Swiss-Prot record:
The chain crosses the membrane at residues 22-39. Subunit j, of the mitochondrial membrane ATP synthase complex (F(1)F(0) ATP synthase or Complex V) that produces ATP from ADP in the presence of a proton gradient across the membrane which is generated by electron transport complexes of the respiratory chain. ATP synthase complex consist of a soluble F(1) head domain - the catalytic core - and a membrane F(1) domain - the membrane proton channel. These two domains are linked by a central stalk rotating inside the F(1) region and a stationary peripheral stalk. Disulfide bonds: none annotated. This is ATP synthase F(0) complex subunit j, mitochondrial. PANTHER family: ATP SYNTHASE SUBUNIT ATP5MJ, MITOCHONDRIAL, MITOCHONDRIAL PROTEOLIPID. Keywords: Membrane, Mitochondrion, Transmembrane, Transmembrane helix. Belongs to the small mitochondrial proteolipid family. InterPro entries: ATP5MJ (IPR012574). It is a single-pass membrane protein. Component of the ATP synthase complex composed at least of ATP5F1A/subunit alpha, ATP5F1B/subunit beta, ATP5MC1/subunit c (homooctomer), MT-ATP6/subunit a, MT-ATP8/subunit 8, ATP5ME/subunit e, ATP5MF/subunit f, ATP5MG/subunit g, ATP5MK/subunit k, ATP5MJ/subunit j, ATP5F1C/subunit gamma, ATP5F1D/subunit delta, ATP5F1E/subunit epsilon, ATP5PF/subunit F6, ATP5PB/subunit b, ATP5PD/subunit d, ATP5PO/subunit OSCP. It is found in: Mitochondrion membrane. Heart, brain and liver mitochondria. It comes from Bos taurus (Bovine). One of its GO terms (cellular component) is proton-transporting ATP synthase complex.
Amino acid sequence: MLQSLIKKVWIPMKPYYTQAYQEIWVGTGLMAYIVYKIRSADKRSKALKASSAAPAHGHH
């Protein structure tokens, strides 16, 4: 369903998008990557804090 919709839109628009919007696609990709990295790092730090919280309370 979604793939056929993408093909219907993408194929006629492809030359236009690849030329005119190449920079925008790169920017969008970078933004998505940065957001993903921040979110995964945030999850990791929260997981670390959660796992190190219990022994840390015992020491203080």
